[in-house]
Amino acid sequence: MEQAPEDQGPQREPYNEWTLDLLEELKNEAVRHFPRPWLHSLGQHIYNTYGDTWEGVEAIIRILQQLLFIHFRIGCRHSRIGITRQRRVRNGTSRS
């Protein structure tokens, strides 16, 4: 009968430590791209909804990841990631 292999990989850091590190990185990145009052309001909304829980931490991580992804995808002027905007020359025709 087969046995499960023993875990011989490197020690993983605890989930809560990893989660807090990820949240800190996301907050630092978000502050560079969004207004602080807006981020503060988001944090207040999460706190009012979830309180001081891990569920709240996971929710704000998920929201910040989505916001930053969309922000970069649309074309952040600070980043080379995203849709390249082509300059259009007006020639009188509309292709809407």
From Swiss-Prot:
It is found in: Virion; Host nucleus; Host extracellular space. Pfam families: VPR (PF00522). Residues 1-42 are annotated as: Homooligomerization. The lineage of its organism: Viruses, Riboviria, Pararnavirae, Artverviricota, Revtraviricetes. Its main location: virion. Phosphorylated on several residues by host. These phosphorylations regulate VPR activity for the nuclear import of the HIV-1 pre-integration complex. GO terms for cellular component: host cell; host cell nucleus; host extracellular space; virion component. This is Protein Vpr. Keywords: Activator, AIDS, Apoptosis, Cell cycle, Host G2/M cell cycle arrest by virus, Host nucleus, Host-virus interaction, Ion channel, Ion transport, Modulation of host cell cycle by virus, Phosphoprotein, Transcription, Transcription regulation, Transport, Viral penetration into host nucleus, Virion, Virus entry into host cell. HIV-1 lineages are divided in three main groups, M (for Major), O (for Outlier), and N (for New, or Non-M, Non-O). The vast majority of strains found worldwide belong to the group M. Group O seems to be endemic to and largely confined to Cameroon and neighboring countries in West Central Africa, where these viruses represent a small minority of HIV-1 strains. The group N is represented by a limited number of isolates from Cameroonian persons. The group M is further subdivided in 9 clades or subtypes (A to D, F to H, J and K). It comes from Human immunodeficiency virus type 1 group M subtype F1 (isolate 93BR020). During virus replication, may deplete host UNG protein, and incude G2-M cell cycle arrest. Acts by targeting specific host proteins for degradation by the 26S proteasome, through association with the cellular CUL4A-DDB1 E3 ligase complex by direct interaction with host VPRPB/DCAF-1. Cell cycle arrest reportedly occurs within hours of infection and is not blocked by antiviral agents, suggesting that it is initiated by the VPR carried into the virion. Additionally, VPR induces apoptosis in a cell cycle dependent manner suggesting that these two effects are mechanistically linked. Gene3D superfamilies: 6.10.210.10, VpR/VpX protein, C-terminal domain. InterPro entries: RetroV_VpR/X. One of its GO terms (biological process) is DNA-templated transcription. Homooligomer, may form homodimer. Interacts with p6-gag region of the Pr55 Gag precursor protein through a (Leu-X-X)4 motif near the C-terminus of the P6gag protein. Interacts with host UNG. May interact with host RAD23A/HHR23A. Interacts with host VPRBP/DCAF1, leading to hijack the CUL4A-RBX1-DDB1-DCAF1/VPRBP complex, mediating ubiquitination of host proteins such as TERT and ZGPAT and arrest of the cell cycle in G2 phase. Belongs to the HIV-1 VPR protein family. Disulfide bonds: none annotated. The keyword Transcription applies. The modification Phosphoserine is found at residues 79, 94, 96.
